[in-house]
């Protein structure tokens, strides 16, 4: 009864049509509304802006156009915006490389000359020579909205298959290119989503996963189910692809396949949505009639295939080891797990098998440490890193004597290294030449207490010489979900923010993967509130320790991090000066009804379960906006082609906030066109959006920018 009253009361408040102070200043457009009321477990909840869930209706299109006009007019009028964009463009304009990988003496890597919208794929046999351009996505669309989404090369380096994503969509189209000639073959695969590709060792074809063709009108909004694993025979139409595995009885399962280094087995990783706990199946490729074997079918832990020695498979897992360990399983015998490398005090983030060694990347308080182990699991030294940052890559094969990796930090642009196993030494392969001095900036790591006493780490980066007077404009970023770790990384956008005099802080919230599965579990489902408490405590730490003040503090996050921002400003609107939620999940009662939203129930829960509903409703940002409350200045960002977190979340959140705002602080929404959830976004669009974000902060936080 109490729940019903609160729900109806909130709905009634939001449906009132009055002119608030903010509306009077900005004259927000009237959003299309309805009398929609839903009932959840006996609780009636109004959803007045339900029509905005259809972004293609004439009413929604008119609203989007009107909102964008208000937002862009406001942003363009900020005097500092042009100067910010100019500096962003200068800082962004530096040559950068991706981590190389090798096939048959050929090195493949991505490169961007600086301001290219998309990275270009290159190949070479010698790094001292000029590489050969292999694939330039910039030539496929004038506006740079077609991006390379995936890649796999045959063992003889003769052919490659690659996926293309259009306008930021999760849907991809896969093609096959001749590496020697640089020309595409006739092979064309559609409706690929959430899939890699893996060639057979003889190069006759590759394995991949896809969905059935969706309804064209609703392909960016409708739910997707029934992933299927196929084998594509080179030179044949997609209609003749061989179905390898499907599970109609498990419509939410996702399949990714990998051919082992020796070519004998197909390893099938089976996941239900975003749940890190997965299953491992395999197929014996030496026997055309072999069936798929369900090796690990309980989904009782996370299992990542590392390598095999004949029928003995090696995995990284958190089974009985929340921080991770390495195990082996002899598939020719009864299921028995042998431990190769035991759990340590640090999170085992990734493992690869290269040059007769295991390369293990650990997280030590959210930054990387790399250790080497022999095949029997005995220690074999470490790979020294340049500092406190993030190392990634370490790809290769058993026969290789080298591997490649990247290193980055909040103040160090990504550098590429080659490690020689024979010499036990790293060689700097590439260091970018940038238009600023990294030595002018510093990062410190602090630890603070959350509401329940939990010790939480946070990185704080800024320009040296900063005065800690409690008045520094600060941008606090967080994510806190899905077992994803927020580790140090360089972004030109953040450098420019620090250059202007701002502080950039990243809180390592529960729900992430920084300290293993227990850390993740402490911020998911019915403990999700811990994530918001951690973020609020991070903000309070920055204020109490004289880094900033409420008036000078802004917060931001994307996707699950957008949810974080939405929840925190509805729970503590008094604590923040500005909020920048990006492609956020704002409607926790309907998220699972769109595209891949159902896949997030492993972290969020489901409104179909009574206990989950109570928790979801308790923090759902859309449902905790109170009319007349003064909320922080807000620039909400989303994209019209986001088919992961559909823009309806941001649309309804913005419309509700605009109707409720009780003071003259702006509530603006910036809706990017021909863009998706963020992956593959063109450089030009990133710079424009970043210029708008920083200009908004400059104006609302009162930051003075010198030319």
Where are these regions (language model features)?
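Cap/lid segment of the alpha/beta-hydrolase catalytic domain
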Residues: 138-154, 163-170, 180-186, 419-425, ...
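Beta-propeller blade signature
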Residues: 123-124, 175-179, 223-235, 280-285, ...
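Blade-edge beta-strand/turn elements of extracellular beta-propeller
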Residues: 135-137, 179-191, 236-248, 286-296, ...
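Bacterial N-terminal signal peptides
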Residues: 7-18
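A flexible loop/linker signature enriched in serine peptidases of the S9 family
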Residues: 112-119, 141-145, 164-173, 188-193, ...
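Active-site-proximal cap/loop segments of hydrolase catalytic domains
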Residues: 506-707
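Long hydrophobic segments that form regular secondary structure
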Residues: 247-324, 329-334, 341-346, 357, ...
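Non-catalytic accessory segments flanking enzyme active sites
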Residues: 58-153, 163, 253-308, 339, ...
């Amino acid at each position: 009864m109490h729940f019903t009253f609160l729900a109806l009361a909130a709905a009634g408040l939001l449906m009132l049509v009055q002119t608030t102070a903010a509306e009077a200043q900005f004259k927000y457009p009237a959003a299309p509304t309805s009398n929609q009321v839903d009932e959840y477990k006996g609780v009636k909840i109004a959803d007045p802006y339900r029509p905005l869930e259809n972004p293609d209706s004439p009413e929604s299109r008119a609203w989007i156009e009107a909102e964008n006009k208000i937002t862009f007019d406001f942003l363009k009028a900020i005097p500092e915006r042009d100067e910010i964009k100019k500096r962003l463009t200068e800082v962004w304009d530096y040559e950068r490389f991706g981590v190389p990988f090798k096939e048959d003496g050929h090195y493949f890597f991505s490169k961007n000359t600086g301001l290219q919208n998309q990275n270009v794929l290159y190949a070479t046999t010698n790094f001292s020579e000029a590489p050969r351009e292999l694939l330039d996505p910039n030539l496929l669309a004038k506006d740079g909205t077609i991006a390379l989404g995936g890649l796999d090369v045959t063992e003889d380096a003769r052919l490659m298959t690659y996926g293309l994503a259009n306008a930021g969509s999760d849907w991809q189209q896969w093609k096959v290119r001749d590496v020697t000639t640089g020309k595409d073959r006739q092979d064309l695969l559609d409706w690929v989503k959430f899939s890699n590709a893996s060639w057979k060792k003889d190069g006759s074809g590759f394995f991949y996963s896809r969905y059935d063709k969706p309804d064209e009108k609703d392909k960016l909004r409708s739910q997707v189910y029934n992933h299927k694993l196929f084998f594509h025979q080179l030179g044949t139409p997609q209609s003749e692809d061989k179905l390898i595995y499907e599970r109609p009885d498990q419509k939410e399962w996702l399949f990714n396949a990998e051919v082992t280094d020796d070519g004998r087995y197909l390893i099938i990783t089976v996941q239900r949505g975003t749940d890190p706990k997965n299953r491992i199946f395999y197929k014996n490729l030496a026997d055309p009639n072999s069936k798929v074997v369900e090796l690990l079918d309980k989904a009782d832990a996370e299992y990542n295939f590392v390598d095999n020695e004949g029928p003995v498979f090696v995995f990284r897992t958190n089974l009985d080891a929340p921080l991770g360990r390495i195990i082996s399983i002899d598939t020719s015998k009864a299921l028995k797990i042998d431990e190769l490398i035991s759990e340590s005090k640090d999170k085992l983030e990734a493992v690869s098998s290269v040059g007769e060694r295991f390369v293990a990347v650990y997280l030590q308080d959210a930054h990387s440490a790399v250790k080497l182990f022999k095949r029997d699991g005995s220690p074999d030294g470490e790979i020294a890193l340049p500092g406190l940052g993030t190392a990634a890559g370490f790809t290769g094969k058993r026969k290789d004597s080298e591997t490649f990796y990247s290193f980055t930090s909040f103040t160090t642009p990504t550098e590429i290294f080659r490690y020689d196993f024979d010499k036990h030494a790293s060689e700097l392969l590439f260091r970018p030449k940038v238009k600023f001095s990294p030595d002018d900036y510093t990062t410190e790591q602090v630890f603070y207490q959350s509401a329940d006493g939990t010790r939480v780490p946070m990185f704080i980066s800024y320009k040296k010489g900063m005065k800690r007077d409690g008045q520094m404009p600060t941008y606090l970023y967080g994510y806190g979900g899905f077992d994803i770790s927020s580790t140090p990384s360089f972004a030109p956008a953040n450098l420019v923010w620090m250059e202007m005099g701002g502080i950039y802080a990243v809180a390592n919230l529960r729900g992430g993967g920084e300290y293993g599965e227990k850390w993740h579990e402490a911020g998911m489902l019915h403990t999700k509130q811990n994530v918001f408490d951690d973020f609020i405590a991070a903000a309070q730490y920055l204020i109490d320790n004289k880094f900033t003040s409420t008036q000078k503090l802004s917060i931001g996050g994307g996707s699950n991090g957008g949810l974080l921002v939405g929840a925190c400003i509805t729970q503590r609107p008094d604590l923040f000066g500005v909020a920048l939620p990006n492609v956020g999940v704002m409607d926790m009662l309907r998220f699972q009804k769109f595209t891949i939203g159902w896949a997030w129930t492993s972290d969020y829960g489901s409104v179909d379960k009574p206990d989950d509903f109570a928790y979801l409703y308790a923090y759902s940002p859309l449902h905790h906006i109170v009319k007349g409350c003064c909320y922080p200045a807000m620039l909400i960002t989303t994209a019209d082609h986001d088919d992961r977190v559909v823009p309806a979340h941001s649309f309804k959140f913005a419309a509700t906030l605009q109707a409720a705002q009780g003071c003259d602080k702006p509530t603006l929404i910036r809706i990017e066109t021909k863009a998706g959830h963020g992956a593959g976004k063109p450089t030009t669009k990133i710079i424009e959006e970043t210029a708008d974000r920083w200009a908004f902060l400059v104006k609302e936080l009162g930051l003075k920018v010198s030319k």
